[in-house]
Structure formats: C-alpha cells, structure tokens
Amino acid sequence: MNILIVDDHSGYLESLKSIVTYAFEDAKNLKITKSLNCENAIQTIKHHVAINKTFDLGIIDYIMPAYNEEEINNGGDLCTYLKKVMPTCKTVINTGILEDFTLFEIDQKVKPDGLTLKSDLSVEDYIKVIQEVVQGKKF
C-alpha cells in the first residue's frame, strides 16, 4: 500500500504517519510518503506518475500555502489534482475549518472519499475512517 500524507505542520504530519502506520500495520509493503506543502506534493505526484506508480490513499490538509505555478490554491485543489492523475487513489481531506457552509463546499467541489475535522476525532475514530475509505466507503 502506497500512501501520501500532506500537511504543512510537521508535528501533525509525523502524528499522521504514526497513525497510518498503526492502522495498516498488517499491509504488505506499506510505503508512506510525506510532503510539507503543495509544491512538494505536486512534484512527488508527478514523479510517481512518470514512473507509473500510484498512491492508494492521499491524506491531505485543506489549509496550506498555495503553489501558484500549478494553480494549486489549497489542499482541496491538490486533492482534485491527485484524483485527476490517479483516479483510483482514495482521498481524505483533513481540516480545522468548522463552518458548515465551507465543509459542504469542500465536500461538493473536491469530493474527497473522506472529510475529517482535525479537532473532532479520536485516534481510534481516525483509524476507522482511513481504513473504511481504503475499503471504498465514504466518510
């Protein structure tokens, strides 16, 4: 299983890596790639496309600095790009945004397989979310 995690907060990124490692500890050939920003994530995705490899799961923070050269304004745009170039990749957007309208807009425009609030889930619940998303369920 090949997983991409993108978050501009290194501490949160490392925590997510630990959670994902635990969630998929039985997975064969688990590979986790981390990116701290949209620019690095785009370069990583392009590299994987060039060598004909795909990510099985992308876990992406919504609020991140833009990568203007590729017109990636936030994690939502990054998620859309990832799904475009790797249509079989499952995606989860993490956000600290609490406004219902904005969450609805993310869900409708980006259409991630999972949408989670950073402040709203326990580790156990987050593990369940990403495991279910990989199995094809929506959250």
Regions of interest found by a model, annotated:
Residues 7:
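Conserved acidic carboxylate
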Residues 10-35:
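Two-component/phosphorelay signaling modules centered on CheY-like receiver
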Residues 34-57, 67:
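Acidic, metal-coordinating helix/loop segments flanking the phosphotransfer/catalytic sites
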Residues 47-52, 81-88, 109-110:
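Conserved phosphotransfer cores of two-component systems
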Residues 106-114:
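As written
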